């Protein structure tokens, strides 16, 4: 432990220029670069954009029940298996999610069915 305390004291006594020189010498000795963590952090920043392009799960959101709410309620019941009251509450409480975490094909199919019944639908 005494050796570590001595090293800490010696490092604390270094000037900024000496610390920079020590850093360079250690990089050469150990074959590492102090700039590597910065490059990794910058590369990590691009990950959310890639995730947005590769989205595989979608939420089907009923934006508006439309003028023909009865047909929309019937379609919501058929798609979700909800009871009449729950389906009515969902349609009248729009915007609300009808289905969550479905594939793109299934989401498009549900959207088409609800729009055919007169609803306005969004995929998120």
UniProtKB/Swiss-Prot annotation:
GO cellular component, one term: cytosolic large ribosomal subunit
Entry keyword RNA-binding: no
Pfam family, any one: Ribosomal_L12_N
GO molecular function: mRNA binding; structural constituent of ribosome
Domain of life: Bacteria
Function: Forms part of the ribosomal stalk which helps the ribosome interact with GTP-bound translation factors. Is thus essential for accurate translation.
Family: Belongs to the bacterial ribosomal protein bL12 family.
Assembly and oligomerization: Homodimer. Part of the ribosomal stalk of the 50S ribosomal subunit. Forms a multimeric L10(L12)X complex, where L10 forms an elongated spine to which 2 to 4 L12 dimers bind in a sequential fashion. Binds GTP-bound translation factors.
Protein name: Large ribosomal subunit protein bL12
Protein species of origin: Brucella ovis (strain ATCC 25840 / 63/290 / NCTC 10512)
């Amino acid at each position: 432990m005494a050796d570590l305390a001595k090293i800490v004291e010696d490092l604390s006594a270094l000037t900024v220029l000496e610390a920079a020189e020590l850093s360079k010498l250690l990089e050469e000795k150990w074959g590492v670069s102090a700039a590597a963590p910065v490059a990794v952090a910058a590369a990590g920043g691009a990950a959310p954009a890639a995730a947005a392009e590769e989205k595989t799960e979608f939420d089907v959101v009923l934006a508006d029940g439309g003028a023909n709410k009865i047909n929309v309620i019937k379609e919501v019941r058929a798609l979700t298996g909800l009871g009449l009251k729950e389906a009515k509450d969902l349609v009248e409480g729009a915007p609300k999610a009808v289905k969550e975490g479905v594939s793109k094909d299934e989401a498009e199919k549900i959207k088409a069915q609800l729009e055919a019944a007169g609803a306005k639908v969004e995929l998120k």
